[in-house]
Each structure stands twice: as C-alpha cells, then as structure tokens.
UniProtKB/Swiss-Prot annotation:
GO terms for biological process: cellular response to oxidative stress. Pfam families: Iron_traffic. This is Probable Fe(2+)-trafficking protein. The keyword Iron applies. PANTHER family: FE(2+)-TRAFFICKING PROTEIN-RELATED (PTHR36965:SF1).
Length: 90
C-alpha cells in the first residue's frame, strides 16, 4: 500500500518514499516530507554536483557540502548549479 504525504519539494500530495533514504534526523525528515519524485530529482542533482565538482563521497568535507546542498535543494529550493554548468539540450 502506498503512503501519501505532502511533499515539501513538489508542494502537493504525492506518493511517499518506501524507506528512509538517509541516516539520522535528516533522513527521518526526508522520509516524512519528500516524495519519490522529489527524491529522484535530488539524486539527479547530486550526481551532477559530484561529476561537475569532482567530488568524492568518501571525503568528509565533500559529504558535508552534499548534505548542505541536499537541504537547500529539497527544503529551500535554492540549490545552485556548479559554476560554468551549461544545461544539456533536451
């Protein structure tokens, strides 16, 4: 049975995640407030950040940066694209 939540990212009722996707309190907040579409959008944005900025998830400072961007992207809608990033043609 699907779980319906009000998604803070999409600003509408939508299908919630099936599991807590991130550790700690932030993971619980994401599980409670972010839907599947919002989480998929974050994963795509995170991949772009890792690739464009040459980040390593093993580096603690890079992980801290990604967590900060996760908060901005999902809850503040203010995450920026990397400097010099050009959107691919659709």
């Amino acid at each position: 049975m699907q779980r319906i939540i009000f998604c803070e990212y999409e600003k509408r009722d939508t299908e919630g995640l099936d599991f807590v996707p991130y550790p700690g309190e932030l993971g619980q907040k994401i599980f409670a407030c972010i839907g599947k579409v919002g989480w998929a959008a974050w994963l795509a944005h995170q991949t772009m950040l890792i690739n464009e900025n040459r980040l390593s998830p093993r580096n603690p400072s890079h992980r801290a940066f990604l967590e900060e961007e996760l908060n901005k992207f999902l809850f503040e809608r203010s995450a920026a694209k990397p400097e010099g990033y050009i959107e691919p043609d659709a």
